[in-house]
Amino acid sequence: MPILKERKWELIRSFQHHDKDTGSPEVQIAILTERINKLTEHMKQNKKDLHSRRGLIAMVNKRKALLDYLKRKNYQKYLEVSEKLNLRVKN
């Protein structure tokens, strides 16, 4: 489930460090979270769609790796991003 271009840029603008920042961990986590939420809704309707389920699991694992990286590098940013995106935080 692709996300709309406008929504993607909205997410980028809210998490970027400077005007041309589109690849920082915070931005990547925000975009992945949006895609995960969309795909989760799709999976509720289409329980037997195993290809999408595999993609969903891959996205969740990628987001977890990015969150772990952010937690190691900048714990304060990790907490801010987690709170802003309503993600559960393990202490």
Swiss-Prot record:
Family indicated by similarity: Belongs to the universal ribosomal protein uS15 family.
Q: Does the keyword rRNA-binding apply?
A: yes
User: Its function?
Assistant: One of the primary rRNA binding proteins, it binds directly to 16S rRNA where it helps nucleate assembly of the platform of the 30S subunit by binding and bridging several RNA helices of the 16S rRNA. Forms an intersubunit bridge (bridge B4) with the 23S rRNA of the 50S subunit in the ribosome.
Give GO BP annotations, semicolon-separated: translation
Protein name (Swiss-Prot/TrEMBL): Small ribosomal subunit protein uS15
Looking up Pfam families in the UniProt record yields: Ribosomal_S15 (PF00312)
One GO cellular component term: cytosolic small ribosomal subunit
User: Per the record's keyword annotation, is rRNA-binding included, yes or no?
Assistant: yes
User: Source species, please?
Assistant: Hydrogenobaculum sp. (strain Y04AAS1)
InterPro entries in the record, alphabetically?
A: Ribosomal_uS15, Ribosomal_uS15_bac-type, uS15_NS1_RNA-bd_sf
Which terms are listed as keywords in the entry?
Ribonucleoprotein, Ribosomal protein, RNA-binding, rRNA-binding
UniProt GO molecular function = rRNA binding; structural constituent of ribosome
Q: How does it assemble?
A: Part of the 30S ribosomal subunit. Forms a bridge to the 50S subunit in the 70S ribosome, contacting the 23S rRNA.
